[in-house]
Amino acid sequence: MKIKLFADGADISEMIDCYNEGVVKGFTTNPTLMRQAGIKSYETFAKDAIEEIPDAPISFEVFSDEFPEMHRQALKLNDMGENVFVKIPITNTKGESSIPLVESLVLQGVKVNVTAIMTAAQVRSLASVLSPDIPSVVSVFAGRIADSLRDPDPIMRECRLELSHYRLEHKAELLWASCREVYNIKQADDCGCQIITVTPSILKKLKLAGKDLDEYSLETVKMFYDDAEAAGYTL
């Protein structure tokens, strides 16, 4: 498979481990993951991550709901390192489009990762302001699309076509976000995505790829038996 794995999280020690193992090619974070990890200082976390991982792309997200402040935060994050991609949500919480902000940042040479995308129409609008000369990431939340009982595959393929229409396929990378299971990696690769974000729990399951299913079945039976024994259950 050609697809690149990016680790999604905000635990510095886990990020360093992934970086040293060489399995993942980049990293993404967001305010929710940072809060869950107990991060108190956004700036300290960002600087520490860049210092520990200086030569792999890392995405940090702006957190204001006002576009002028988003712009200021984006420039500050961009200045922290050459490997930084600035995450911009496709809209603010009022549903107002972030496309004008993205256009302004791209014109200033900022590498953006536009996030929380769910539709090909959003990608179409975004593609019109991205640059074929500046790297960018288009994060489509395939896992959340699937949560809504919709098949994400045709949507992801349509998003890929939108980027190709604007001749952006070599600079604007399509990212399959909110991965739910290991098989999503194959799905994303088949759809033409260049990147998929994976959690540490998904990364640990990669060793199961190609595992003999009869052997896996027996291991599962043994797990149930051992847990029942350990619990001391009786009937």
Regions found by a protein language model. Give the residues of each.
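Active-site beta->alpha loop and helix N-cap motifs at the rims of alpha/beta catalytic domains
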Residues: 1-16, 20-24, 28-108, 137, ...
